[in-house]
Amino acid sequence: MKALIVYDSTYGNTEKLAKAIAAALGAGATVVRVSEANAAAVGKAELLVAASPTTGGRPTEAMLRFLDDLPAGSLKNVKTAAVDTRLKAKWVKIFGYAAEKIASRLARNGGTAIAPPEGFFVGGTKGPLADQELERAAAWAKGIAAK
């Protein structure tokens, strides 16, 4: 499956997550930082995974811009999935998480979600990723590859 993993990362945690997902998806997977992503690459993908840290209850501005700039209907025949990195703190739930907002924008552009939005935990604002999160991300990716 031709998979494109588009990510943004502030402290490197979401980048590590994106690379773990790509490795689990196999040879057909490409990882691209959101600043280098474009609609042409998205159009060639069978699967688009968008990954962002949660910042103030939402994805980064760069990820939001990328998703909002995709041409209408550009994801019509594309399977999609949304992931984020997030804190475990209970107060964060008040603001929500990036993955849900990413998933909404992917659907708005015609994408077919093949998994619910997924969050992966970091130990603090700057990380690191919590224990076993990279392994959990790999297992998650193998699960969506089977769909």
Q: What do the PLM-derived regions correspond to, one by one?
A:
Residues 7:
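Local sequence-structure signature of Cys/Sec-based thiol-disulfide redox active-site neighborhoods
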Residues 10:
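Donor nucleotide-sugar binding loop of glycosyltransferases
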Residues 38:
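Acidic, amphipathic alpha-helical patches
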Residues 3-4, 13-16, 22-34, 44-147:
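FMN-binding flavodoxin-like domain, especially the glycine-rich phosphate-binding loop
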